[in-house]
Each structure stands twice: as structure tokens, then as C-alpha cells.
Amino acid sequence: MENPSASRDNKGFCFPDIPVEEMDGWVKNLISEEDMFSSSSTSELMNFESFASWCNSPSAADILFTQYGLSTSQSIIPFGGLEGSYACEKRPLDCTSVPRSLSHSLDEKMLKALSLFMEFSGEGILAQFWTPIKTGDQYMLSTCDQAYLLDSRLSGYREASRRFTFSAEANQCSYPGLPGRVFISGVPEWTSNVMYYKTAEYLRMKHALDNEVRGSIAIPVLEASGSSCCAVLELVTCREKPNFDVEMNSVCRALQAVNLQTSTIPRRQYLSSNQKEALAEIRDVLRAVCYAHRLPLALAWIPCSYSKGANDELVKVYGKNSKECSLLCIEETSCYVNDMEMEGFVNACLEHYLREGQGIVGKALISNKPSFSSDVKTFDICEYPLVQHARKFGLNAAVATKLRSTFTGDNDYILEFFLPVSMKGSSEQQLLLDSLSGTMQRLCRTLKTVSDAESIDGTEFGSRSVEMTNLPQATVSVGSFHTTFLDTDVNSTRSTFSNISSNKRNEMAGSQGTLQQEISGARRLEKKKSSTEKNVSLNVLQQYFSGSLKDAAKSLGVCPTTLKRICRQHGIMRWPSRKINKVNRSLRKIQTVLDSVQGVEGGLKFDSVTGEFVAVGPFIQEFGTQKSLSSHDEDALARSQGDMDEDVSVEPLEVKSHDGGGVKLEEDVETNHQAGPGSLKKPWTWISKQSGLIYSDDTDIGKRSEEVNKDKEDLCVRRCLSSVALAGDGMNTRIERGNGTVEPNHSISSSMSDSSNSSGAVLLGSSSASLEQNWNQIRTHNNSGESGSSSTLTVKATYREDTVRFKLDPYVVGCSQLYREVAKRFKLQEGAFQLKYLDDEEEWVMLVTDSDLHECFEILNGMRKHTVKFLVRDIPNTAMGSSAGSNGYLGTGT
């Protein structure tokens, strides 16, 4: 008998003609027909007085009336246009209806599941089911007349959702929407904020923004057998969520209670020893590449298939299945995250697989060629199901390549590298890709690329395979990381990613996937480069190391900027002549201090071979600013550097920088001692020590050294100054004279102290009066060379849009005092900012210690300038360490 009060009203979920007690009993009797429901718990959960706070919509009555025969089904008008389904847009209204559900048990299960989920969930959530209905000859997904839970703040969005229908069949509609995609794929899809979708990907975008919708997740609902998807449960929140792990757990528990389930992440099969070896090498390669090129993250994708194990549990089996399309899943243990902020993206990839052809990974799997995208954010979600997460984390360019390992035969591995997010220029991306290819060639031992013939025949690696190892000059092992330079020009190395060219700059933004580079395109790229840049080799550059960079650029016929770029391609981070001048200044400073020591006739000479001070007869030596190293000093310095080189047991890797911040990993070079005129002996000996990357940990390839490498000439300066300070205070210092050895008073014992902190500051006793006097003499000596020069410098510090100007004595003020002066003028907290000065190469250099400050003053002195510019930069709170002191200064105070 039809209930006369079953008509709809617009006053929410209420029944004015039926008492609540009677309605509660009616629901209890209906649900008690199912053995799986407990009548006692159902009475409590289905109490409409408590349920009314969640269901505050006119359609709440439709859920019960329509499903249980209290009213006839009513026609609905589909919501056409862009915001609705395209499949039913032009159909007559009288042909479209929402028929009564064929299975009451499924509706009851969903209603019960929502009741259980209500216990676990919090506020600010809309939960609604989408089920397939037949509209004409097609099946569409609709949430009208389906169970739902509602927070009053999302009532408007619920009403808008009732007017939408989405395609329930593949290839039926170009825009299936979020519920349609999940129903077709059977895989959950979520986003922390719907703003990361495009309007065509989330058809209810306008209504979501109007109702302040943020997070959203759609979950497929499967029958107990798990064979097919019968509905989609959509959860919508009012706040942005980093993930939906808690909600997923609650939904799984609620569905299991009513004999339903959802798709879960399959358990990984046990790996064989060969698979473990291959994955371990992939992990080491990805880690080294990310460190060398400063990549935010790199992922390892493996084709796999699903099979049912014990207790009908899905098991992920690695390897391609010829009977069905392979699914690509990431292997978490082999991925590497260099930027910890990207961990959320890796977690999202763990929850979602890719099919063949999806994203650059799927394209690399089927093409056997590297696949590149200049911006993965421009993908459509159907092309790349993880695009909304890529947009959230701001990922930009990426490249993927398919490899195979000799350990596992024809098993494929897809390595996906994400380029730095700040690198957006096509030329910069191309340079980094070329550099990345060279790095891969040196790192891989058993990994090789796959040719088309191997992919078809399934045979072993043939001659067409691009061998990425088999390089006798470079050896890589898991326990150690020892490399040497290839005896070839870096530019001649064949690039694995050379198929991707920067001559298609206009096509990169719009095209995705594999870009096949033709020979003509490569030639056009070379034409854009100057002929000088192509022909300048390392041997040619070495001939100009003794002069200045500007003179070398003029001789080579290029501008200084181009020459710097050429140097970075060869791993030269700073022009050597500047380093030589720095050594000259250091040695002159040492000799001036030695000459000022009292109590010794003639003076002192520092022997870098023995590390001792030798007294000599009276001598006069002029320290002209344009004098170069004498032959004795050069030999002594070379011997001293050679001694210090013997203490290095692990050879560091050199970092080569390219335009746009790209970094290239290169091996240490051994140059010929019989080099051409003007070349230096072992110029790479000191260049390689400038790198901040030292792979010295046997168990952690690519780990950064805990201590920053110190310049060798700075070490020499520290030893000399420390010894002079001890000699000035009457400490134990042996002085050799022509007729014997004189040993001063041994009453005070001390030892030379070297700095062990990362800043490389000189740790000298501040109570040494003789050292203070020596520095004053140095200042007098330096100032005497310039007529009319002042002993004070003008400081111009800029913080944001403000600039202050003040004077200081460069030989009295230390780094900590300079920081205090700047903090006082800008009213900043000490330790909350950092200073950078503008050097002679127009680059901003960090000012951290007193040695940095002295270096700054020496540069100004060489440039004949009396004004220094400082840039004040804020330091994030997370970067402030307690070991640096309260003011963030890493040096020693006075």
C-alpha cells in the first residue's frame, strides 16, 4: 500500500505524518530481514533523529521511499552542457528515467555501510554513492535516490551532484568525470584539493568552488567476489587533506562488515636473489644521479601482473604477461627522493598503477626509446592518472627510459627522472639530459637499453643494444665508488637521451611522450652554437689558465660568459688564475708575518716541505702586487699539495655545472705532466677538491661529506699563522740558522690548531698580542702601497627594498661584529639572516666566517675599491642550527 505522505517536500529530511518511533521500527523490520545485520545495532544506527543531522536534503526521503516501494519512481531531467554527461545531452526528456534498483540487497548494504562509516568519520564530510542506471540504451552513473551522508555545509554541493550523470562505460563519453573514471578503471582516485583538476577533468568544478569543496576521493565498491565494480563511493571534504588514509581505512572496514569490498594495493611477491641484485643497482644509480644533477626524485617502475594467492589475496607478480596488458607499479625500495617534500608524490604513486601508454613511463615501455615531457603538468588525467599530484608538487620536466639487467634477463625496468622544478627552458633541459646520459653510462654495470629487435624476439642483448657499461675506464660497485675520467671529450659522448632535442622548443609545451630526434635536427642544434664553443677542449683551455678569464676570452674570440659556460662543461667551477692569485696573496701575507717576528736576525722563511721555519740572513724582498710565484714557491707549493694529496684515500667525484643550474657528475682527471706551455701541473688536483660531493661512505654511495673540503692554500696559511702566533708568545718553535738550531723557551707548550668546523675558520688564540701586532703591520703594509688610501671601507647593505650605508675598519671588525652592525640597522634578529658580498666576477658569495671576510677585503684591495656591497637574505627557521651560536655566525668570536 502506497504511503500517502511519501510526497517530497523541500524542508529537509523529515516526515510530518509519520511518528519517528514508527519510522524507526519500520526501518528496523526491513533491515532485520538480512541475517548479517544486527537488529540491536541497526536500531541505534538507523535512528533518524541522529541521522537527520547528516541528511539535510529533500532527496533523503527518496532513498527509502523509492527503494522500498513507498512511492513510484519519478523522472529526472539530466543536467546537460559542459557540467553534465555528453552521452545523454540530446536525448528527449521523456525517454530518460531513473528506474527502480534491481537489487534491494545492494542498496541495504550501502545504507548500512554508510551508517557504520558515520561512526568512524568526523565532521565536514559528504559521502554519497554513485550507481549505474539505464538511460535509454546506455548506463549512466547517478547519485539521485542513493544513500548518502551529509554535513550541512555541503548541502548545496549535494543538490548540485544530484543533477549530474556520468558515463559508466568506457569509450562512451570523452569526459566521464571523477565517478566515471573510477567506475571504469576500478582504481581509487583522490586529490587533496579539487583545484588541481582541470574543469574538463572535474565537471562540477564551479559548484565545488561555490560550496568551498577542497579534498575529494572516489572509491570503487566491488562485490564480495571482486569481479566487477557495482558502485562508486565519493567522499568530499571542506578542508584540504594531504591524504585519505584514515578515510580509506574506515571505508574498508564498513564495506567488509556488509560483505562488500574495494580495490586494495596488492601484496608484493617475494623477490629472487637476481631481482634483488638488479633493484639494488637501480637504487644506487638513481641515488647517484639525483645527487650529481640535483634532481628532486627518481622513480623505478616495473611491469607486473596480478594473481590471486592464498585466501584470494591479490599478489603483484613482476614481469610482463603476454596474455594481457602489463601494469606499471613503482618499487618503493628502488626509488630515491632527493627533495623530502616530494615524498607525498611517491606515496601517491604507490597507490596507483599506470597502464601501457600512460604517462612518459607507459610510452617508454611500448616504444623502447626514451620518453620526455617538458612539463608533465600539461597532461590530461586520462593520459597520466597521476597528473593532479604532479600539479600539487609543482613537478616540471621528466624523462623515462627502459632498461634491462643481465641479472634478470628480459625483465624490463623503467627509470623516471624528474628534472629540477626551476628548470623550464628547453635549452637548459637539453643540456641536463645530455649530462644525465653521460652519468648513466658511467654508473650502470649490468643495466642496458633495449633495442626493438630484442623486444620482439625476446633474445639476449645483441649488438644493437646501446651498452651503458662495458667502459674499462669507469668501474662502479655497490661497496665503493671509484671512477676516473674517460679519455675522450665530454661533448663526444653519445647521449642516451640525444633523441630529445631542444630545437623543438615550441612543440615541447604542447606535445608529450617520446620525441624522436632526427639527424637534421641535431645538426640544426649544433649550428646554433658558436664554432669556438664546439672546438674548445680542455687542453686548449689549460694553455690560458695562467692569465685572466677576460684575456682568455678575448684570445679565444668569445665573451667571458660563454667562456664560463665552456669551463663549467669541463668541470671548471672557477677560473684557475684567480685561485693562483689567492695563493700569491696568502704567501705574501705569510712572509710579511714571518718578517715581523721579533728576536730573529734577518727573518724567517717557511719551508713547505719540512713544515718548519728556517732563519736566513738579512734579505730584502719586495711584494709587488703584480708579482707571480717564484720558482721556489711554486715547487714548494706543489710539493706541499702533493703531500696533502697522499692523505686522501677516496677520490671525490667532480661536479660539472651547466646553464640553468644543471650539474654533471664527472670523474677525477689525471692530466699529462708534459702539458703544453702555460699549463699547470695537475690542474685538476685542486679543482676536484672544490666539489661538495664526496662519495666516501661504502654503504651510502653519493652521501655528502660531513665536512666541507678546505682549500689547500688556506690550510697552509692556517699552519703558518698558528706557528707564528706560538712563536710570538714564546712557545716551542724550532728555528734553524746557518750555524745550528736555536730552541726558544719551552715554558709554555701548545700545538697548532686547525679548524675542524665546516666553515674552515682559523682558530687562533685571541690573547696573542704579537699576532695582533702582525696583523696591524700587514694592514700598514697594504695601505702604504696606495697613496692617499683610507683604512676604512664603506659598506652598503641591502635588505629587500631598504639600503643602509656605514663605514668600518676592515682589519678590526670581524664577521660576527659585521653581522651585529647589519642586524642593528635593519632591526633584525641575529642568526635570522645571512650576508652575501659581490665579488670581482659579479657573483654573490656567502659570508660566513672571518676568512670569508678577509677574502672579501683582499678582492676589494685588488680591485682598488673602497666600497663593498652586501645582500641581506632571510634564513628559514628550519635552517638555523644551534651549533652555530645565537647569531648564526659559524666562525670564532673575539
Curated annotation (Swiss-Prot):
Give GO MF terms, alphabetically: DNA binding; DNA-binding transcription factor activity
User: What ranges does the record give for the region Disordered, renumbered to this chain?
Assistant: 732-763
RWP-RK domain ranges (all copies): 517-603
User: What does the UniProt entry say about where the protein is found?
Assistant: Nucleus
Which positions are tagged coiled coil?
578-598
Question: Gene3D superfamilies, per this entry?
Answer: Phosphatidylinositol 3-kinase Catalytic Subunit, Chain A, domain 1
Q: Which InterPro entries does the UniProt record give? A: NLP, NLP1-9_GAF, PB1-like, PB1_dom, PB1_NLP, RWP-RK_dom
Q: Which UniProt keywords apply?
A: Coiled coil, DNA-binding, Nucleus, Transcription, Transcription regulation
**GO cellular-component term (any):** nucleus
Positions with biased composition (Low complexity): 747-763
| Chain segments annotated as transmembrane | none
PROSITE patterns listed in its UniProt record: PB1 (PS51745), RWP_RK (PS51519)
Residue stretches making up the PB1 domain: 792-875
Q: SMART domains this protein is in?
A: PB1 (SM00666)
Where does this protein chiefly localize?
nucleus
Function comment: Probable transcription factor.
Q: What is this protein called?
A: Protein NLP9
